[in-house]
């Protein structure tokens, strides 16, 4: 970490001073700064120095595991992760503060934060206790750190254990309110969603078949889908994956044997519904449910059927941004009263405290549901960027989350 010319010179001097003074927390601070700047080599040096001073530092080993992960040293990353949590599976994260802040216990697994919480639960506002359920040793005498509310970050239904005795033990010992029950999360699985939402008027939820791994080999997949009476075209994707990763639009059975799907516990085959608008574009709306109430998050408009905000080039067309702005400012008016009431009822039916939904609007005003689950990411946009208009609506979502968490935290 020797000083270099440029803006990092002071950071290097700080690291050298910390080494001389055997100050592990300062070295960890330096390592985090270097990691954020993608200076992984010097971050590793600072972390190794911190661990030489304090070999029990869970946070230093966590960051070192992250350094190894992003630099492709996967076995070393695994080893550091195991060392980090061998004796510490409840980790308290807090910033110095004179005022008492609500403390939120985050129920999660090692490396599995399905609900991104950086913006939802900022350290400036909350003390956080990360409880790593897959590392928990309930008989080792560990006491749960003080907390006011539990936020279940295990929002990916395909990754949940059924039943989960570790989660049950957490609830038994805690006695505090829980946000996002595992049972409600499990019901958002793609093949269960239609049953969960059955009876809601003015919505369409395409049929979904879940094909377990033993029947999902390329040579057997078409046969299994035929046995179930699935009709083409089908969207076939690996369980637990999002963002279009591994998805195939199959118009005939022969395509299935020619496609290589990423390894997964199962595949989902969803009946494809052409949702193209009259102008030839595909529209995907996203709303976030906070305390079961829908709040608009974005609208992506694309000439391709596989619509994602990051690939829709929204900033390239003023008309797209203006249409999105109208949705964000007046979602009820844009969707229509019938579809908006359906959206509200979906939020109630999901019974999740935090969740999201991706959907489109069909010509007759029916709401076409793509997915609804707790893994939806909410983040501010660049204040000077083309999508900065979203930030006031992002802030509305965050403020609603803050209010919900603090309301539950004060319950007796």
Residue ranges and their predicted role:
Residues 15-16, 49-50, 83-84:
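Canonical positions in the second alpha-helix
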Residues 90-216:
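Conserved N-proximal alpha/beta basic substrate-recognition cap immediately N-terminal to
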Residues 21, 55, 88-89:
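Short coil turns that delineate tetratricopeptide repeat
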Residues 243-342, 346:
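Phosphate-binding site of ATP-dependent enzymes
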